[in-house]
Amino acid sequence: MLDIQLLRKDLDGVAKRLADRGYTLDVAAFAALEAERRETQTRTEEMQARRNSLSKQIGAMKGKGEDTSAVMAEVGGIGDEMKASAAKLDDIQKRLSELLQGVPNLPHESVPMGKDETGNVEVRRWGTPRQFDFEVKDHVDVGTPLGLDFETGAKLSGARFTMLRGQIARLHRALAQFMIDTHTQQHGYTEVYTPYIVNPEILYGTGQLPKFADDMFRVEKGGDENTVTQYLISTSEISLTNTVRDSILEADALPIKLTAHSPCFRSEAGSYGRDTRGLIRQHQFDKVEMVQIVAPETSYAALEEMVGHAETILQKLELPYRVITLCTGDMGFSAAKTYDLEVWVPAQNTYREISSCSNTESFQARRMQARYRNAQGKPELVHTLNGSGLAVGRTLVAVLENFQNADGSVTVPAALRPYLGGIERLEVAAG
């Protein structure tokens, strides 16, 4: 959530920056609510001052033995008015909060201007795409003989669900384990196992609600317990980041670096007809997530570090990729700045997103009330960052396609072989 003081000080300036990312702020609605708030607050303060004055007058009158009934009646009337005014002020504050909860973060000054993904800027590339001397297959054709089972996944759960069997299941597990080990052993993250079901207020904290409710899977408890709507996580960023909600951390507790391997559940609303073949866009997929909770002055250095951590995974797997900076019109709701890592997908002859690393600055922290004690000992909002390290299913896609062989086998990247008992190739079973 944006700091409301920013809007109060420079409403037109904030509206301009939001317009840069394709969001139209309802300036008139905010200005009207603010005017109503100021008027109500001023009236409340005037009544408070009048009541205080009358209370002193009552004391003086009693000291003189004078009749105070009329003045006390006026004080009582003011009290009733103040209660009504306070209720009105609470309602205005609630409406202001609801308005702000739908407003995205402000883009950092270094973010390139652009309306959509065509405005994204490439930062660097690593690796050279392999030149094949045979006809390249996509991951569906490579993976199906090795245990990729879309038919059973669809039979069990419908479209965009997949079952992995045998060698493919082992490779998928090896990828996740390799990522977690790298982040915990080399990058200083603490591994966390998180709940996959969270309460609505947790999603408000990280910005999925209220704006993106249609992208989530909702669940309800069975039995006789009071029914409360909860949600399946769309990323473990949600649960990891909210570990510091309603907290005041000591400065020496920062940075906090957390990582988790979890399934992610997304309804993919609005994605009809996109990436219908294969593993690229699924309702359920695994991801290894990185989250950092840091002091504000270090957050952009932390963002660069986090991107480097995601790059390390791709480099160890020998997968060609590129890093791009998302433009103002292509960033996610909570982000102030985002880098995407895109891996080379040979069958599509293009790069596809495999990681997104974002600095949300204080946007999520304000919604969660996550603070730390700064150098002056005063509570200040932390900055929160999140990044994929990596999307496991899409990494599986990249391995299958980049390491495929003419005979249908897949060479196992050297970094993964210790997780697969030293196996160097996934072979298609005879017959």
Curated annotation (Swiss-Prot):
Localization of this protein: Cytoplasm
Annotated residues for binding of ATP: 266-268, 353-356
Keyword annotations of the record: Aminoacyl-tRNA synthetase, ATP-binding, Cytoplasm, Ligase, Nucleotide-binding, Protein biosynthesis
Disulfide bonds: none
InterPro entries on file: aa-tRNA-synt_IIb (IPR002314), aa-tRNA-synth_II (IPR006195), aa-tRNA-synth_II/BPL/LPL (IPR045864), Ser-tRNA-ligase_type_1 (IPR002317), Ser-tRNA-synth_1_N (IPR015866), SerRS_1_N_sf (IPR042103), SerRS_core (IPR033729), tRNA-bd_arm (IPR010978)
EC number(s) per entry: 6.1.1.11
Record NCBIfam families: serS
Domain free text: Consists of two distinct domains, a catalytic core and a N-terminal extension that is involved in tRNA binding.
Family, as annotated: Belongs to the class-II aminoacyl-tRNA synthetase family. Type-1 seryl-tRNA synthetase subfamily.
Protein name: Serine--tRNA ligase
Species: Paraburkholderia phytofirmans (strain DSM 17436 / LMG 22146 / PsJN) (Burkholderia phytofirmans)
Name of the encoding gene: serS
